[in-house]
């Protein structure tokens, strides 16, 4: 297991790095006192969870010896790695100007420029010990997260989960949807008394919809649209892509089509989930 220690000057991207590591399955703690590192590692060792901890001037130990002692007391199950993020002075000044945040050392009556320089001196013991130093001056938030995934996991993007959900327009559009497709124009099994009590998960309803060319065309064109843009969506630093399919009541057409799309992308090796909002409401 890995204990990733994330350090660097304020404004260099430590919070972004921690969020990216959390997305990769790390247990993340911001500004944990260094002396507590061994206790955290021992707690997580039994659960076999890698951890990431940020260290900056706010929780920097008074002497390098305290840090070295904490490292030597880590359980053998953990392999410590020190990631140090930095950026050039002008970039840090610009980022602080953009966010209008106070530098942690500004309380010491230092100007922003002086605080940045002072912080650099205080963090030098960690910088000199770093396993990896990353200059984020020319990096966007997404590029930094992508670089960390490449370094640590050997792949460029996080694995996107596609969620296909059916819903009824009379109950409202799901607020979590990235895409909403309206299928109320397709043939409606509701008007067949035998099919009315069934759902899009039942074979007779599926057989009814499968007989209509327009249903096949809609499924084909929708999956083609999603396939066209999926590569770009997968590199957009997102964890989920939610595709909502809506019909009038959310019981027949939307359920069937959501399942058809989910099955198709699942067969292509994608991480896929499906859910049916109206049907879930009907469960006792």
UniProtKB/Swiss-Prot annotation:
Q: Its domain of life?
A: Bacteria
The knockout outcome noted for this protein's gene is: Cells lacking this gene strongly overproduce the GlmS protein.
Annotated GO biological processes are: protein homotetramerization; RNA destabilization
Q: Name one GO cellular component term.
A: protein-containing complex
Q: What is the effect of changing residue 270 to A?
A: Lack of activity. Does not bind GlmY and GlmZ
Which parts of the sequence bind ATP? 8-15
| Region of interest called RNA-binding, as start-end residue ranges on this chain | 266-284
Q: Can you tell me which family this protein belongs to? A: Belongs to the RapZ-like family. RapZ subfamily.
PANTHER family reported in the protein's UniProt record: RNASE ADAPTER PROTEIN RAPZ
What is the stated purpose of this protein? Answer: Modulates the synthesis of GlmS, by affecting the processing and stability of the regulatory small RNA GlmZ. When glucosamine-6-phosphate (GlcN6P) concentrations are high in the cell, RapZ binds GlmZ and targets it to cleavage by RNase E. Consequently, GlmZ is inactivated and unable to activate GlmS synthesis. Under low GlcN6P concentrations, RapZ is sequestered and inactivated by an other regulatory small RNA, GlmY, preventing GlmZ degradation and leading to synthesis of GlmS. Displays ATPase and GTPase activities in vitro. Can also hydrolyze pNPP.
Record-given protein name = RNase adapter protein RapZ
User: Which source organism?
Assistant: Escherichia coli (strain K12)
Gene encoding this polypeptide?
A: rapZ
